[in-house]
Amino acid sequence: MAQQVLGCTSRPIRVSLHRCSVITTSDTIRRKNLRFVRNPRLSFSLQSSTRNYRLPSINCSTVNGAVAETAEYYEGEGDNVSLAEKIRQCIDFLRTILPGGSWWSFSDEVDGRFIAKPVTVWRALSRMWELVAEDRWVIFAAFSTLIVAALSEITIPHFLTASIFSAQSGDIAVFHRNVKLLVTLCVTSGICSGIRGCFFGIANMILVKRMRETLYSTLLFQDISFFDSQTVGDLTSRLGSDCQQVSRVIGNDLNMIFRNVLQGTGALIYLLILSWPLGLCTLVICCILAAVMFVYGMYQKKTAKLIQEITASANEVAQETYSLMRTVRVYGTEKQEFKRYNHWLQRLADISLRQSAAYGIWNWSFNTLYHATQIIAVLVGGLSILAGQITAEQLTKFLLYSEWLIYATWWVGDNLSSLMQSVGASEKVFQMMDLKPSDQFISKGTRLQRLTGHIEFVDVSFSYPSRDEVAVVQNVNISVHPGEVVAIVGLSGSGKSTLVNLLLQLYEPTSGQILLDGVPLKELDVKWLRQRIGYVGQEPKLFRTDISSNIKYGCDRNISQEDIISAAKQAYAHDFITALPNGYNTIVDDDLLSGGQKQRIAIARAILRDPRILILDEATSALDAESEHNVKGVLRSIGNDSATKRSVIVIAHRLSTIQAADRIVAMDSGRVVEMGSHKELLSKDGLYARLTKRQNDAVL
């Protein structure tokens, strides 16, 4: 019953086949008795075995989105399998590995979170041309030298053969002329090939740079909800390996394809002039080779997409593990994390195995057809020489040019398969590049002449796009007057930080609206608004740069070092900063600063902005008691500054932090349940009073 529920309907049977074990599962990671499978399909087990095993039962469970099968193997029971059954299993296996068999299928290897639409080769090339169009002279120079080099190279066999036979005939004048032309062609080809390689390398650099610039810029201006559905490892994989894979199109693939198409066309014309019957035979063989090449190229395109997805998933696991290394080390889960990473590596190896097998078939096809061309040329050409229809010199030229044509076809096919891989990798990159920026960055909002800081939440409700069935905030009505300090408290998950995210316009309310000085928030210029808001989060993030740059981060006005030091002193960060080896020039590192020190730098950053609206989301949670007391005094002075009249919103679990607030809003399950001063809420004996009592009891 468990197998039917989890979709594990097939029972893998392992048989001995020339010391190569075969298992009837496709996506299999063999770690002792643990295997991850998506669907029943044949794949190789890389472990050799001389014994037969039979799998009587399988217990299924879900591990990281895959199905884990814990199998029990028993020795000796393989002898009960009849010879006819073994032969039938071997025949079934051989049938699956034939072209078109199930072993070659990738139908459900990857469940992508962001499904990309297929991109045609022409569409991909036109997109790449758009990226390099500003430097089209580099492309033109590259292709111009390519044409000269290709034409020079294709004429070399003619003069090489003519030189040999003119020397044999004793015609010295013709021999000297042919040698001079041969030297000229070789020198011209060498010079143009070098210039061609240089210009194509420059074009490759331009393409990958522009592609990464465009993709990075596009991602920067997406809604926050987009990043909620994507992982950092996946996005960095698009910027890194995927863009690099696509950039090979101009510098390598198109370069070699055009070069060999020119040379192959020249060789074919020359062959038809020499002997049209032999030329047609060679052309037929090249057409067969081209058909095989097309099928192989399409297969390579599909494998490239899967390798792209699996590589991104592997990068995601590695990045997550490295970023949480302290947690991994404390809980001793190194082996589990290795198994998670190895899961994706095994899937990558499984696809690469089939990719290598496909390449082997393509290579076998080429060599077979290549040697067939030689046999036909020698057979038919020899008979033609005996009949007096052609000369030995003509046959020699024919053999050289037929070989050139076949190899040109092979190189076109090889690079075309690489081109198809690059096009497959480009699908997700181009689809991300086509994403429209957030409406906040497109529309030009209103900029108020004077901002007083009057904030109103009017019947605001909100659900996160990733789980829109759950209402995080419901019908919230809160008003914050200029110069007022309003604290928001409640249990975890009650919607406190969500209100801050809505005020910062990281998300739009599902219903209701937020007013700032009577103007709907969505009508205001986002950049202008955020420049007037100071925000300190409960887990402040600092950039890997010096402390001074972190403090002045986001300020659009000229900031002096004295301003930075003044803000740091107000945040009680100056003393520990000056104690660091390089003071304010110290590069921030996670191991260098404690959580409290990071929070004080974040508070200094907010103070330096001189904001009209100050938002503190658990801004003192990582501070010690003395630092918290000092910072609270600074924050009170900031909020009560008569010259600026800042509006301050404080979110805190430490209720001692917000007792002096003008008003306290208590929230529960996304709703406002109480509102008033500290004394008023204590007298109501409601949620706030219960929270206060619990914290006091915890202290005692």
From Swiss-Prot:
Q: Which PROSITE patterns match?
A: ABC_TM1F, ABC_TRANSPORTER_1, ABC_TRANSPORTER_2
Q: What are the transmembrane regions? A: 137-157, 182-202, 268-288
A molecular-function term among this protein's GO annotations: ATP hydrolysis activity
User: GO CC annotations?
Assistant: chloroplast; chloroplast envelope; chloroplast membrane; mitochondrion
User: What's the main place this protein lives?
Assistant: plastid
Q: Which family is this sequence assigned to?
A: Belongs to the ABC transporter superfamily. ABCB family. Multidrug resistance exporter (TC 3.A.1.201) subfamily.
Name of the protein in question: ABC transporter B family member 26, chloroplastic
Instruction: Point out the gene that encodes the protein.
Output: ABCB26
